[in-house]
């Protein structure tokens, strides 16, 4: 992209006596000094990057952001930080906006690449840099004329939430800190990366962009520009507002508030494609957190639909992000987590899913684990949940006088406890279902003897409770239409239904027969495509 050499090894030492007292000459001296220390391709990249942002050249900005910056990072700064602000400021004429954006990338790189992670000072400085950026665009009387590619805006909001999550986990690890560090963290830096700051920023971006009104207008067939306002008319503010809704979904999910997580997305029709869902990483992240929230709310049918739809999308659009290794790794990991969550949901709430998703579950041996879960193996449920769940955080830091301990796992263990309590209530239901599927009528006493050959009258009474539990757990709230993901109608998700008359269970099989047409059409098309490729091979 840019040709250049490594850092000069024999750069002149910085000479305070070279300062003349003339601000212009001193700035020229600093520019030359820092430029001499910096590889040429890094220097040219920063100058061109700054110029592209000044001019609002989206094509060049996106190319440098997505391609050149990662390439230079790999070549020069694989496990080290990029040049500090003062070094960059000297060669970009102290451009305020560019320096804020550069520092966002600078601290993001430190979080991702530096062994051991960022220091406390770097975490705090990153927070204040985000404050500078958001104050610049939110507090302005008139819209800031800044053009950035949508992928950068998404990753900026996503990174903002990630660094909040990372700081909350760092703050909870008391065993790795001295008493002075704990005191400094809890007293001097109690407001930095606080949950109130994070929510305030995200809600402010949503409000200033009028994104909710715009989404409502679109759903009603009205031109969104009529309700967008001066700020929301600009793509920069509109997309930041949209991505902030997804950021709020993630924050509330990390806190374990699943109702509010779905609630903040009400203007977005979750199960429909929109013009705003053109960033694959954003769409995948949205579906992951929505599906997980549905699962924890015991809305398994909605969770299965959410996971199935996005996993099909990932299968069909891999080429969109496969060239970007960092995105590929992240998306592959999230896809693997969603397969684990889908397996859990299918065990707790069996239903038909797309054949291609079933094929992946078979190829990756999920069926063995699913069989163990159906047999009541709680350890498999636990391991799947721990692998696939978000890394939960506590909104509050540990108390200053709290015992020296690692509090990072407390939020996750609490969510695991809630989930496993639900699983324990359902672990006997697959056995009950398997017996009911064999009959159209079945006496209560006979079913009780199947479950326990030495069943007593008390066991028959307990069986009624189990059957009532089966009825209750198989009736879920299922979304059907409307912008709110919280709405829906109660439906039975089981492939069989029953009622009890005196001591007799009457069973009806409501299973819908498989439609094999789509499956064979896909296989025929795949075979024809393969046949064409074989014919084009020259032997």
From Swiss-Prot:
This is Eukaryotic translation initiation factor 3 subunit L. Component of the eukaryotic translation initiation factor 3 (eIF-3) complex, which is involved in protein synthesis of a specialized repertoire of mRNAs and, together with other initiation factors, stimulates binding of mRNA and methionyl-tRNAi to the 40S ribosome. The eIF-3 complex specifically targets and initiates translation of a subset of mRNAs involved in cell proliferation. Pfam families: Paf67. Residues 306-514 form the PCI domain. It comes from Drosophila sechellia (Fruit fly). InterPro entries: eIF3l, PCI_dom, TPR-like_helical_dom_sf. Belongs to the eIF-3 subunit L family. PANTHER family: EUKARYOTIC TRANSLATION INITIATION FACTOR 3, EUKARYOTIC TRANSLATION INITIATION FACTOR 3 SUBUNIT L. Component of the eukaryotic translation initiation factor 3 (eIF-3) complex. The eIF-3 complex interacts with pix. One of its GO terms (molecular function) is translation initiation factor activity. Keywords: Cytoplasm, Initiation factor, Protein biosynthesis.
């Amino acid at each position: 992209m840019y040709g250049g050499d490594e850092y000069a090894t024999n750069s002149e030492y910085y000479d305070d006596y070279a300062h003349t007292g003339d601000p212009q000459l001193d700035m020229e001296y600093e520019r030359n000094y820092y430029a001499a220390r910096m590889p040429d391709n890094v220097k040219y990249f920063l100058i061109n990057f700054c110029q592209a942002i000044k001019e609002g050249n989206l094509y060049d900005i996106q190319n440098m952001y997505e391609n050149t910056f990662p390439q230079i990072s790999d070549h020069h700064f694989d496990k080290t930080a990029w040049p500090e602000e003062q070094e960059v400021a000297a060669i970009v004429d102290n451009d305020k906006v560019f320096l804020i954006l550069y520092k966002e990338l600078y601290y993001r790189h430190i979080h991702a690449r530096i062994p051991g992670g960022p220091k406390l000072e770097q975490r705090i400085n990153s927070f204040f840099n985000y404050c500078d950026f958001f104050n610049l665009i939110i507090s302005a009387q008139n819209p800031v004329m800044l053009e950035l590619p949508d992928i950068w805006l998404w990753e900026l909001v996503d990174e903002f939430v990630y660094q909040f999550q990372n700081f909350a986990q760092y703050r909870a690890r008391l065993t790795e800190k001295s008493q002075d560090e704990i005191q400094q963290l809890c007293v001097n830096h109690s407001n930095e990366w606080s949950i109130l700051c994070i929510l305030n920023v995200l809600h402010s971006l949503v409000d200033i962009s009028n994104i909710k009104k715009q989404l409502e207008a679109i759903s009603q067939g009205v031109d969104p520009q009529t309700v967008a306002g001066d700020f929301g008319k600009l793509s920069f503010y509109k997309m930041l507002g949209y991505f902030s809704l997804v950021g709020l979904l993630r924050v509330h999910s990390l806190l374990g508030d699943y109702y509010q997580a779905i609630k903040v997305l009400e203007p977005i029709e979750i199960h429909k494609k929109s013009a705003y869902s053109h960033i694959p990483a954003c769409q995948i992240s949205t579906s992951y957190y929505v599906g997980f929230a549905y699962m924890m709310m015991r809305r398994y049918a909605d969770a299965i639909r959410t996971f199935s739809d996005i996993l099909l999308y990932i299968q069909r659009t891999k080429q969109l992000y496969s060239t970007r290794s960092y995105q590929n790794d992240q998306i592959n990991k999230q896809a693997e987590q969603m397969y684990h969550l889908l397996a859990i949901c299918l065990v707790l709430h069996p239903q038909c899913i797309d054949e291609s998703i079933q094929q992946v579950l078979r190829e990756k041996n999920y069926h063995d684990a699913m069989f163990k879960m159906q047999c009541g193996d709680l350890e498999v449920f636990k391991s799947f949940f721990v692998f696939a769940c978000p890394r939960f955080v506590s909104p509050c830091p540990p108390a200053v006088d709290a015992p020296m301990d690692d509090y990072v796992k407390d939020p996750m263990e609490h969510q695991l406890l809630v989930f496993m309590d639900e699983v324990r209530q359902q672990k006997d239901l697959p056995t009950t279902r398997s017996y009911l599927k064999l009959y159209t009528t079945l006496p209560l006493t006979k079913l009780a003897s199947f479950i326990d050959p030495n069943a007593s009258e008390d066991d028959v009474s307990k069986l009624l409770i189990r059957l009532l539990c089966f009825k209750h757990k198989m009736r879920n709230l299922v979304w059907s239409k409307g912008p709110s993901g919280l709405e829906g109608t109660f439906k039975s998700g089981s492939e069989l239904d029953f009622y009890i008359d005196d001591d007799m269970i009457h069973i009806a099989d409501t299973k819908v027969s498989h439609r094999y047409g789509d499956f064979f059409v896909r296989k025929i098309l795949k075979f024809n495509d393969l046949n064409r490729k074989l014919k084009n091979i020259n032997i």
